[in-house]
Amino acid sequence: LIKPNHHELGEIFGVTLSEWSDVIPYAKKLQERGAKNVLVSMGGKGAVLIAENGQIIAGESSKGVVKNTVGAGDSMVAGFMAGWMQKRDYEHAFRMGLASGGASACSENLATRQEIETEYEKTAVHYL
């Protein structure tokens, strides 16, 4: 798993990326270079997962009040990995990542398990 944000992904390839549709071809280029799963966070626009099995899933966490974004990306990675270990299902792992990152961004510190579970229930994803 590699998890750049859309700015970092753009820097790698010398382009500006602002929409999910912009991100996908460059995330696939990372896969061509050896990454299996590419999870790109896009701030308030959510995130997109380009999975090794070919699935492309996009989504957003609920629109809570952002209090502290420090650690939100790390929380997203941790949530994704925990979700993957639970069910070996990309949609579940992606939703867990979105929920963990979103809940942490809306907390003063890292989110609690209850906050993440509540956010998970509000998190919708769709396939591209």
Residues covered by each model-derived region:
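Conserved beta-alpha-beta core of the PfkB/ribokinase-like small-molecule kinase fold
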Residues: 1-25, 46
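Conserved phosphate-binding/catalytic region of the ribokinase-like
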Residues: 20-128
